[in-house]
């Protein structure tokens, strides 16, 4: 895996490709939110698991805008299944406490749960609950 800072104005979150007989995943960290970077990583891992890197295809993840829709939808479903293996059946309200409960029930961080709920259109992107989500750098600083 390789990290390359996002290009100014660029829209690339990640790329998966092959070099000799090995897959390579490149992440830009674009957006910096931990949930977004984690999903980009899992999306590119799904391309690798599905063997796309072996076909001489470079898989570029630009916020879901690249690649044929059928392939990208399958890759997104696989990546999402790794985050929420049992799917998502929201039962709590969407207050911070409700999201924390839902995240705990699903074994993910509240930041990841917020990102999934936003991606599913269940809570808006401009939601108050997402304003203070940690960046990747902030999240890594808490690991010890």
Sequence positions of predicted segments:
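Active-site hotspot residues in diverse enzymes, especially metal/ion-binding acidic/histidine motifs
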Residues: 1-144
């Amino acid at each position: 895996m390789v990290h390359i800072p996002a290009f100014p104005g660029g829209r690339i979150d990640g790329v998966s490709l092959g070099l000799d007989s090995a897959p390579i995943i490149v992440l830009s960290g674009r957006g910096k939110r931990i949930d977004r970077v984690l999903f980009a990583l899992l999306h590119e891992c799904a391309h690798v698991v599905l063997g796309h890197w072996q076909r001489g295809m470079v898989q570029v993840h630009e916020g879901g805008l690249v690649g044929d829709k059928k392939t990208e939808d399958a890759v997104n479903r696989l990546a999402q299944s790794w985050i929420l293996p049992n799917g998502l059946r929201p039962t709590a309200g969407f207050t911070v406490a409700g999201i924390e409960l839902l995240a705990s029930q699903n074994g993910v961080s509240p930041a990841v749960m917020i990102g999934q709920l936003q991606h599913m259109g269940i809570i808006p992107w401009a939601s108050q609950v997402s304003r203070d989500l940690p960046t990747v750098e902030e999240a890594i600083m808490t690991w010890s």
